[in-house]
From Swiss-Prot:
Organism phylogeny: Bacteria, Pseudomonadati, Pseudomonadota, Gammaproteobacteria, Enterobacterales
GO terms of molecular function: 5-methyltetrahydropteroyltriglutamate-homocysteine S-methyltransferase activity; zinc ion binding
The protein's name in its UniProt record: 5-methyltetrahydropteroyltriglutamate--homocysteine methyltransferase
Family as reported in the entry's similarity comment: Belongs to the vitamin-B12 independent methionine synthase family.
Primary role: Catalyzes the transfer of a methyl group from 5-methyltetrahydrofolate to homocysteine resulting in methionine formation.
Keywords in alphabetical order: Amino-acid biosynthesis, Metal-binding, Methionine biosynthesis, Methyltransferase, Repeat, Transferase, Zinc
EC number assigned by the record: 2.1.1.14
Tagged with keyword Protease: no
GO biological process, one term: methylation
Length: 754
């Protein structure tokens, strides 16, 4: 039984973000549809060949997407919201873009479909919409066309399909309420049709992704798998594919299915390989997800070999990435600025393919010398001074319960803060960033490229901060911000100023659609060599008598939006960041900054996939925030900001943060999110966002007043703040001025109405 290699998917965007550039050029009307389609074909052909050359035996086909693979599945099933349908019922690539973006070069604009996080990753998918009595049909044949492409190129392939149960689980009901699981019988004929077409093409194996099987699913959903897979059995061999967690809790459901193989994530799950081997049907293939598809670290292949070698010869075995390599940058070899030592610790998508090939060869031959050679830098890293900082480790070990406690409870602090700031009722503020104009971005780029010296750069940034203060004073805001002109990204900026992080040149990963991010990498113990934000905050405060907020990104968000170390726990990393930023809070306070905002938009999205694991995560996540903030004196007001999310199931933890003020996104939910705070009897102050910054629309005074009155029905008015939903970085100045002017006017009207 020869062991083969495969990946669950490969990055789509291209090494130089070619797909992003082609998409945005097409959307802007600067290139043709044919040019866009040609870029897609070129990228697919290149990526298949690269994986093949790196040693992958079975190439994934169907992992490419023009926007998102869940959206591609929606089109495959003919699931197009009525507002996005073509008059003649046809579908084209613009149909797909209208669903994802709300507009495309052809067709009428309409509200984009909702977007949310793909399980617990930083990738976003387009949420399928379901309605009662909906019909499904195979119309969008992208998968079949790409299979034909790959076969014509002579590749040995494994088509990839998102499974029917997970697809329904990921969607939402629109209109009249009903159980979306009842649609399963209606989508299965489309899956049967697709599998029949693949069988006609001589396909042996199909990877069918059911990551919902790692969740704590309701029994009705678990029960749905057997009839679904009974309907799909018999045409091709099915590799039931799971990832992001282990399958052991749902293994009884899995082993009853008529499939021929199972893929398990042996990185993020706690499944025992020996137990899996014992419980799986003897004729099933086991695909072992041994190489981490979600991180950038070189694997210890000697360890992976030991983990799986006992199964060699006992059952059919493949070695694979834990999940799609979509979540990893493409190619380490093009990184020229990483020093040799650090570079030797990393492996990007192509290098991970090479790791799989090395592991396959060793398992097939029993020769492990190549594995030991590959793994040598990992042994060196374990003892590197770049990784370990004794002072940080000592400080972390010395944390006590007192370090996460403010001096006095909120009621006492609130009195001290009222006496210090003397703010009016309905105080107005913004979330932090102001428009990142072409001038600001150009200034940073020129400085980064060496075209501008430090003095001229600082002079330019100071001028933009000054203008931001002038604008806010002119508008009549009560609590100001410096505008963050010096920051490119809320995580990258802090990573650049903390020891323990490194940055890549081309380490791009897809976030959604054409948006790519370049996460920092945590390589070692984290510390703060010098103050980060103090100078600009102090300068901004010197320009006004009104309070200016200090602006920090919180420890959990920095952790969640970075590539973390694998040799320590996430809790350890978060608390190291918290200690570093605790010193920043103390320095801001010493510099006269009386209000400090610590943003934690990622607190909820970092939750483990299984509800039973939430408490442990929330305990250390909340503690990290409190360690960060608790150094502040009573009269220093601590704010936090959280992006749009459900709060009702984590309200205990939100309250436990003990922030003096929390600002949240609520305008899109018509203040419904405040129900959670009302029901919980949330004790501290709240700033419910009164307008959606993701839209260029300017809200009217009357509309904002109505929202605030609705908020005051749930939260006492004396504890309410007035602010936008989120930062204003992506907006232009004209709509920003107009919207903030109306927001301030609405607050003034409510004060006068008292």
């Amino acid at each position: 039984m020869t062991i083969l290699t495969h990946t669950l998917g490969f990055p789509r965007v291209g090494l130089r973000r070619e797909l992003k550039k082609a998409q945005e050029s097409y959307w802007a009307g600067n290139s043709t549809r044919e040019a866009l389609l040609a870029v897609g074909r070129e990228l697919r052909a290149r990526h298949w060949e690269q994986q093949k050359q790196a040693g992958i035996d079975l190439l994934p086909v169907g992992d490419f997407a023009w926007y998102d693979h869940v959206l591609t599945t929606s089109l495959l099933l003919g699931n197009v919201p009525a507002r996005h349908q073509n008059n003649d019922g046809s579908m084209d690539i613009d149909t797909l873009f209208r669903i994802g973006r709300g507009r495309a070069p052809t067709g009428e604009p309409a509200a984009a479909a909702e977007m949310t996080k793909w399980f617990n990753t930083n990738y976003h998918y387009i949420v399928p919409e379901f309605s009662k009595g909906q019909q499904f049909r195979l119309t969008w044949t992208q998968l079949l066309e790409e299979v034909d492409e790959a076969l014509a190129l002579g590749h040995k392939i494994k088509p990839v399909l998102l499974g029917p149960v997970t697809y329904l689980w990921l969607g939402k009901v629109k209109g009249e309420p009903f159980d979306r699981l009842t649609l399963l019988k209606d989508i299965l004929p489309v899956y049967q049709h697709v599998l029949a077409e693949l069988a006609k093409r001589g396909i042996e194996w199909v990877q069918i992704d059911e990551p919902a099987l790692v969740l704590e699913l309701p029994q009705a959903w678990l029960d749905a798998f057997k009839p679904a897979y009974d309907a799909l059995a018999g045409q091709v061999k099915l590799l039931l594919t799971t990832y992001f967690e282990g399958v052991t809790p749902n293994l009884d459901t899995i082993i009853a299915l008529p499939v021929q193989g199972l893929h398990v994530d042996l990185i993020h799950g706690k499944d025992d390989v020996a137990e899996l081997h014992q419980r799986l049907p003897v004729d099933w293939l086991l695909s072992a997800g041994l190489i981490n598809g979600r991180n950038v670290w070189r694997a210890d292949l000697t360890e992976k070999y030991a983990q799986i070698n006992a199964l060699v010869g006992k059952r059919a075995l493949w070695v694979a990435s834990s999940c799609s390599l979509l979540h990893s940058p493409i190619d380490l070899s093009v990184e020229t600025r990483l020093d040799t030592e650090v570079k030797s610790w990393f492996a990007f998508a192509l290098q991970k393919c090479g790791e799989l090939a090395l592991l396959r060869d060793a398992l097939n031959s029993g020769e492990t010398a190549a594995l030991e050679e590959w793994s040598a830098p990992i042994q060196a890293r374990r003892h590197s001074r770049r990784v370990h900082n004794a002072a940080v480790e000592k400080r972390l070990a010395a944390i006590t319960a007192q370090d996460s406690q403010r001096e006095n409870p909120y009621e006492v602090r609130a009195e001290a803060q009222r006496a210090r700031f003397k703010l009016p009722a309905w105080p107005t503020t913004t979330i932090g960033s102001f428009p990142q104009t072409t001038e600001i971005r150009g200034l940073r780029l020129d400085f980064k490229k060496g075209n501008l010296d430090a003095n001229n750069y600082r002079t330019g940034i100071a001028e933009h901060i000054k203008q931001a203060i002038i604008e806010q004073e002119r508008l009549g805001l009560d609590v100001l911000v410096h505008g963050e002109a010096e920051r490119n990204d809320m995580v990258e900026y802090f990573g650049e100023h903390l020891d323990g992080f490194v940055f890549t040149q081309n380490g791009w990963v897809q976030s959604y659609g054409s948006r790519c991010v370049k996460p920092p990498v945590v390589i070692g113990d984290i510390s703060r060599p010098a103050p980060i934000t103090v100078e600009w905050a102090k300068y901004a405060q010197s320009l006004t008598d009104k309070p200016v907020k200090g602006m920090l990104t919180g420890p959990v968000t920095i952790l969640c939006w970075s590539f973390p170390r694998e040799d320590v726990t996430r809790e350890t990393i978060a608390k190291q960041i918290a200690l570093a930023l605790r010193d920043e809070v103390a320095d801001l306070e010493a510099a006269g900054i009386g209000i400090i905002q610590i943003d934690e938009p990622a607190l909820r999205e970092g939750l483990p996939l299984r509800r039973s694991d939430w408490d442990a995560y929330l305990e250390w996540g909340v503690e990290a925030f409190r360690i960060n903030a608790a150094v502040a004196k009573d009269e220093t007001q601590i704010h936090t900001h959280m992006c749009y999310c459900e709060f009702n199931d984590i309200m205990d933890s939100i309250a436990a943060l003990d922030a003096d003020v929390i600002t949240i996104e609520t305008s899109r939910s018509d203040m419904e999110l405040l129900e959670s705070f009302e029901a919980f009897d949330y004790p501290n102050e709240i700033g419910p966002g009164v307008y959606d910054i993701h839209s260029p629309n300017v809200p009217s005074v009357e509309w904002i007043e109505a929202l605030l009155k609705k908020a005051a029905q749930r939260i006492p008015a004396q504890r309410l703040w007035v602010n936008p939903d989120c930062g204003l970085k992506t907006r232009g100045w004209p709509e920003t001025r107009a919207a903030l002017a109306n927001m301030v006017k609405a607050a003034h009207n409510l004060r006068q109405a008292k």
